[in-house]
């Protein structure tokens, strides 16, 4: 806590900013409060990634869209209110081709690991009685994904 006043201006100057200029960096409290905030942030990111994965699967498997068509959908989404780093990199991944000119996305191993922050967010939500179903399902999907040999 004593160091915050000394570094606040530096950190807030280099931090991302909201549209109104408010820095996306602030002191959130003592005793691991910042770590808790980061854990929740990562849990939300798990949910976002799960939504992106499910949207991709629906477009590819149900709608029969090509990687180029899916790329365009993500590009359109990234121009509107869904604009985000995760949508942007999903858009970019859809455009990558391998040395044969085929979509690289189809050659990426379909397993996902985890470091635990999504799981910790879900466990904390359960302890607090907060329904956090998207993050919980995202964690379960990652657990299933990691067991490729058992699920395929």
Q: Where on the chain are the PLM-derived regions?
A:
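Rossmann-like NAD(P)H-binding beta-loop-alpha module
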Residues: 1-18, 39, 50, 58-63
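Small-residue helix-packing motif on alpha-helices
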Residues: 4-7, 70, 135
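Conserved Rossmann-fold dehydrogenase catalytic segment
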Residues: 15-46, 63-82, 86-87, 91, ...
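A general alpha-helix detector
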Residues: 39, 54, 120-121
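Catalytic-loop motifs flanking and including active-site residues across diverse enzymes
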Residues: 47-51, 117
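A conserved active-site cap/scaffold subdomain adjacent to cofactor or substrate pockets
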Residues: 103-152
């Amino acid at each position: 806590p004593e160091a915050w006043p000394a570094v606040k201006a530096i950190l807030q100057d280099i931090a991302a900013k909201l549209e109104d200029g408010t820095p996306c960096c602030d002191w959130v409290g003592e005793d691991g409060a910042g770590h808790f905030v980061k854990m929740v942030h990562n849990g939300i990111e798990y949910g976002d990634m799960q939504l992106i994965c499910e949207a991709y699967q629906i477009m590819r498997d149900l709608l029969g869209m090509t990687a180029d068509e899916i790329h365009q959908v993500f590009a359109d989404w990234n121009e509107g209110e869904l604009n985000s780093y995760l949508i942007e990199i999903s858009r970019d991944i859809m455009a990558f081709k391998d040395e044969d000119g085929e979509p690289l996305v189809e050659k990426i191993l379909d397993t996902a690991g985890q470091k635990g922050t999504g799981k910790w967010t879900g466990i904390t939500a359960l302890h607090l009685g907060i329904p956090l179903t998207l993050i919980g399902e995202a964690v379960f999907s990652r657990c299933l994904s990691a067991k490729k040999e058992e699920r395929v």
